[in-house]
Amino acid sequence: GSRNMVDAVQWAQGLKGSETIAKDVEKGKKQFVGPELRGKTLGVIGLGAIGARVANAAVALGMEVLGYDPYISIDAAWSLSRSVQHCVTLGDMLPRCDYLTIHVPYLPTTRHTINAQTLSMCKDGVRVLNFARGELVDTEALLDAMNSGKVAQYFCDFPAEELLGVKGVYCTPHLGASTPESETNCAVMAAAELSDYLKNGNIAHSVNLPDVSQPRVGGRRICMIHKNIPNMIASITSAVRCNIENMGNRSKGDYAYTIIDTAEAPTEANLDELRAIEGMISVRTI
């Protein structure tokens, strides 16, 4: 990292066979001097399950932590340390960061989140970390920023031809999920999330649908997948014709998902009216 540990380890390996290793170490270590993390400012783009943990860990290391996530979930917000400062825009955050890390999914809207414009807002010598998806960073803009001194170092888990061999760029071979536990954990998580969807209608980590999760309230639950179009919620609440005790709705691209808890069971006529709404894809009761 900023302490040049990778270069230092490689240099130390080259001392094998020397009869004056201790003296060589004392003389050579000066070339690997780097700044401490304590007191530095970390910007975290994306405060989901991973981003929130990174932010909290950085707080524990004595860093000032800034967070940016316009779509942060309630659960993630509750899990954040109170020391994490919320930034409304990237423009509020980037000029203050010594380090910048990104933890968002790859979507058409997040492609090249780190680009020439965002990098121009950073302070000179910023260190950028990307262990989420390679496409989140515009590689050409990043290399230009490194050549100008705007970016001091770039760490990523996604080697690419244009990145390899560049001074200050450190690539690992996509090691993010390469652990003995990951395969089991992924299977357990998938089973738990599928069970939660079947039993409660909650959605987590879907590719095409938004995350929507809320505790059960009332006697019955109606779960609806529909197009993300205007006046849909008004049409749904009008057609339910039951006392609504709780409701959740989120969208993702062209699609949206709505959960409604009602005190009494909806009639088949109510459900048919919901299914007949323009843009409705599926209606399920639990």
Residue ranges and their predicted role:
Residues 47-48:
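Glycine-rich Rossmann-fold phosphate-binding loop(s) that bind the pyrophosphate
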Residues 36-37, 123, 217:
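Short, flexible coil/linker segments at domain boundaries that flank nucleotide/cofactor-interacting
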Residues 164-167, 175-286:
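NAD(P)-dependent dehydrogenase/reductase Rossmann-like domain
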Residues 51-52:
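N-terminal Rossmann-fold NAD(P) dinucleotide-binding loop
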Residues 40-43, 64, 221:
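Residues that mark the start of a beta-strand
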Residues 66, 70-162, 178:
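Rossmann-like adenosine-cofactor binding region
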